[in-house]
Amino acid sequence: FAKDLKIPQNFEVVLDVDLLLQEAVERVIGKAGEDPEFTKVLLDFALEKIEDDRSWDIGFDLLKIGKLIFDENNAAHLKSLNAIELGDFLKLQNHLKKQTKDIEKKVEELATACLELITNAGLDFKDFPRETLPNHFKKIIAGNYSPTQLYNNKLENNLIEGKILKATVKNAPIDLAPQLLVYYQTIKQLIYKRGLFANINRNIVPFALLNAIQKELKIIQEEKDQLSISEFN
């Protein structure tokens, strides 16, 4: 039976997976200060917790993350992480950070171009109802990239319909609204792309640590000729 499963003849089935997980988490945390990559990932994780107003004690959250390993619904998916090294996660993180900064620079340039387009057309920002449209671009230039705050309004519809100026404003360029619409929609696509990258980036560190815990669990079980009850089943 053991031979068929390619496990030690005298293997021990571990019923208390919490103890096994605790040891794996302690080993992962213990690498802080020894391994530069682990140190960076653990520090990033702790800083994320502080930013979310959670306790800086990462042990509790690592245990919570680690329990996903013993859920049979996750087993097949998590095994696919085994071939990924910690450095690969960090490379992806750095790549996404660069892409995010590039997007931020691009949308700032486009939003600035929108304001210039308005002023070059001989218009004042006060010519727009409540200055909503100019303020929209000003928010982006100021670093507001929240889709909820930027796009929970009728600005796009107004641009499509050409209803962007006060009724008292006459002789505005006919092509102003269509031009601004192109800028608006281009920026919108980039803002949502940035949001996607940010969400992926937020999950890279937890995934990297989950992978590290999974590898430590395997090492521990091989050292002690053990098999967790979830794997045995």
PLM region descriptions:
Residues F1-G143, E223:
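Conserved ATP-dependent motor core of P-loop NTPases, especially the RecA-like helicase ATPase domain
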Residues K3-N10, L21, A75-K98, D175-N233:
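Accessory N-terminal region flanking or inserted into the helicase ATPase core
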Residues E34-E48, D127-K215:
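Coupling/switch/interface segments within P-loop NTPase motor domains and analogous charged loops
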